[in-house]
Amino acid sequence: EICLSLWPFIRELPRNIALVRDSLPENMEAGKKLLGQLADDELTYQTMYAKQCVLAGITPDQLKFDVLSEPTQMLCQAMRRWCESPNYRDGVLAVVTAELAATAYARNTLEIFEKYFSDHADEYSKEEIEDGLEWLRLHSRPHTRHAIWMRRMLDDIEVAPGDSLPVPAEQVLNALYRLWKCPIEDNKPLLEGAL
């Protein structure tokens, strides 16, 4: 269900990231490099994610039609809003939030998926499993260069550590919480800003 619910967001992500990349000032070289790679002009990450969906039992025909549940709509709208903002800082915060959330999700679920498909290896080909888990594996690995570029990009927009999340980050994160069906009681203070 999560695979299919995230698909519309994943499909829009290259466009959203490219909008932010193209709005950055010339002096934000690290940000341009990072967003240039994340924009996925060749749709490599998107193809990996589609293979993950197929491994989860979703047909390619199902991927042609968006499943726009309320949480999916909220996530797509939040990401679009901040990536299309005239203030590139908003888009940077939205993209960084989405990227860090993808990393956290992959690191927390990869082992579970690997165990499941290992236990059911007789039901899938080795290639299906490898291809289907590639997106999770990629996002669970550390990417030092990306981390350095991300830190420099955040320094360039002068994001200081603090007690509260910037609004774009909070709204994208809250939309993800809803989509992932995180317990509302645990996230109530964060969810208030997304309603």
Q: How does the language model describe each region?
A:
Residues 1-195:
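Non-heme di-metal
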